[in-house]
Amino acid sequence: MRVFQRSTCRMPVSRATVTILLGILFGFSITYYLTALKSLTNPIICGPEQQIGGFDYLDVISQRADADVFTRSQSLPGHRRGLILVAIMTAAKYVDTRAYNVWKTWAQHIPGRVLIFVAEGTESVHEDMPLIRLKGVDDTYPPQKKSFAMVKWLAENMADEYDWFLRADDDLYIRGEELALFLRSVDSSKAHIIGQAGLGNSAEYGLLALGSTDNYCMGGPGIVMSRDTLLKVSPHLESCLQHMLTSHEDVELGRCIRKHVGVACTWNYEMQKLFHNNQSAIKESYAKNMKELKDAITLHPIKDPAVMRKVHLRNREIKLREARAKRSLLSSELSTAKAQTLVRMTPNRTNDLTPWEYINNNKILFCADRVNCPRHTVDLSIRTEMADTITQLFDEFNTNARQRGRVLQFQSLQYGYMRVEPTKGVDYVLDMLLWFKKFRPPNRTTISVRRHAYVQQTFGKLRSLSEGVFRSNMRANSTLIEDPTLHMIMPLRGRAAIFARFAQHLKSICARGGDDLAVSLTIVLYSSEDEMENRETIEMLRASFIPVTVIEMGDVSFSRGVALMRGAETLPANALLFFTDVDMLFTCDALKRIKSNTILNAQIYFPIVFSEFSHESWSENDKLLADAFHYGRGRGYFRHFGYGLAAMYKADLMDVGGFDTKIEGWGKEDVDLFEKAIKNGRLRVIRVPEPGLVHIYHPIHCDENMPTAQKDMCHGSKAASLASIDTLVEQIAQYT
């Protein structure tokens, strides 16, 4: 056994060695002290007179005094950089539209900071936007100078603050959570430039002075640069700007980075999905189909602010769905959770059974107890929900696909069943065709298989919210005060007896409505043979202390759209308008629901009215009923295709564009207004069956000289109002 003992020998240390060590220690101390002192004495806000950098045409300037936004900090010990800074380029004509829309949507969900770069002298009415004004830069297109100046500003002011920098346009949508997840998987200490690689379109291919193996990151879908890339390219921006070979700023930025940093854009096929660029139909990009959103980090181009808000809402829905699914999964793992079962409710009676609806190849729906049953085209809402369900289903299937060495891909839906349990959720039985792929050697194979999937979507917990809190939240941005009076606007030409019935009914409603139901009536009166009788009825209403305003139209062609707009023009912007017809009867509760379902600057109400069939088709029991407020299958139907009755505030009517006053005669003006309200994007449209609104049957006469679209609508409404399907079947049965 060998024993090791500590030596007692000491090596002599010379005086020169000690002096060198002390000098090194003293030098480090002085350097640290001077660095810290410099960081304290340097200005942190770029004032109007301060130049950044050495080039006049690349100098940049900020005139907003927000120290949190424009901080030039040094890397102090323990300083931790943020993840990403998004730099958005925009022009003066878009700063208050596209740029502000971006700032209010996806920019609020970026895990870092967002700055908006504009030309020198650009002003905005929105003080909350973080604008950076670039000195000596204008809105000349192509924006090479603006792009290079922005990159230089980032390098000299923000390089020590963030690991990643994203150059973006004002028509780009970014999913912040997915961007953060992607960037945290990449080493930020190395030089990177990430985006969708491009070589130019078909007209420019071969004309961009690119080498056989060169590419560039397309500017539209966004360009991500690491901090190292930004610092290395910054000193060479002046030279690159003076020696451009094309007019495309993204091509030249990529060329400059490739030359002086030595990295090129990520040449990866998957980047086409992650940084998605829609080149097929720029004007309608993502307006209808947003299937690319699920797999994308960025979407480009979205030039319409309404579409941008729609895409943002869809993205938040996806995140909410994921959060709910995670909550449901965690809840199911609790020891107190109920065991999962396909039978969520045991019916006690036959009427408690919820019928299943059959879906044939995702195109035809066979249903019961719904509108247009038993067979009709699958609604867009159902198609969208099923697509989301299938996508989520396969995402869960493929969670551990790499470890298992196999992946499942959806092909098509053969058929399916669906039912809605009102207190539980939605149940699906889906027969699907899918690809089963094994990608791990030596058993690589692809097989087409058919499988059944049983899917349950569970509703979230009920929440109660008072009407006062709800309305105050919805109208938080409104500067107008809602008028409590319900202003009914009604065009009238002839039909004295029908108008007398309407007036008598309105008189009785107002008599028992109480103080909380203030109603006024605006009549847009056209000349007719029985005009004097109508005027006598108007005086009777005025004698009943009902405010009545008459707008004289004279002997001109009847146009419902023109009449309703004339009536609305006489009222203030905060007036609650209810467009109605002389054939309508209503209850006091219906008028109160109209008031509660209409919110200024937030919500428009299109009630679905109950329309009577021809009285000749009624059964004897229906004819014996005293009033109109009964709802049998043979008595009438809820007119889902009619939009003539609507409630909204005048400010919202003008915001959506109002009625089309070029339409003459009967129909189409209501459909046009409804479509405008839907496309507006800012206002929510609520549409529900309203049992308190009943349209009394009257013979419909369709003028054959009407435009084709109006004539088809008129004939369709006339046919639908003759009798119920049950009555028609009984009539046919007599001849079989």
Swiss-Prot record:
EC code(s) of this entry: 2.4.1.174, 2.4.1.175, 2.4.1.226
Q: What is its main location?
A: Golgi
* Residues carrying sugar: 278, 348, 443, 477
Q: Read off the InterPro entries from this record.
A: Chond_GalNAc, CS_glycosyltransferase, Nucleotide-diphossugar_trans
GO molecular function list: enzyme binding; glucuronosyl-N-acetylgalactosaminyl-proteoglycan 4-beta-N-acetylgalactosaminyltransferase activity; glucuronylgalactosylproteoglycan 4-beta-N-acetylgalactosaminyltransferase activity; metal ion binding; N-acetylgalactosaminyl-proteoglycan 3-beta-glucuronosyltransferase activity
State where the protein is found.
Answer: Golgi apparatus, Golgi stack membrane
Q: What is the deletion mutant like?
A: Mutant hermaphrodites have a defect in the invagination of the vulva epithelium and produce fewer eggs. A similar defect is observed in RNAi-mediated knockdown. In addition, RNAi-mediated knockdown in embryos shows severe cell division defects including cytokinesis reversal and increased number of nuclei per cell resulting in early embryonic death in utero. RNAi-mediated knockdown in adults shows a normal sperm production.
One family name in Pfam for this protein: CHGN
Q: Which UniProt keywords apply?
A: Coiled coil, Glycoprotein, Golgi apparatus, Membrane, Metal-binding, Signal-anchor, Transferase, Transmembrane, Transmembrane helix
Gene3D superfamilies of this UniProt entry? 3.90.550.50, Spore Coat Polysaccharide Biosynthesis Protein SpsA, Chain A
For this record, the Gene Ontology CC terms, alphabetical, are: cytoplasm; Golgi cisterna membrane
Which family does the record claim for this protein?
Belongs to the chondroitin N-acetylgalactosaminyltransferase family.
Outline the subunit composition.
Answer: Interacts with mig-22.
Name this polypeptide is given = Chondroitin sulfate synthase sqv-5
Q: Which gene encodes it?
A: sqv-5
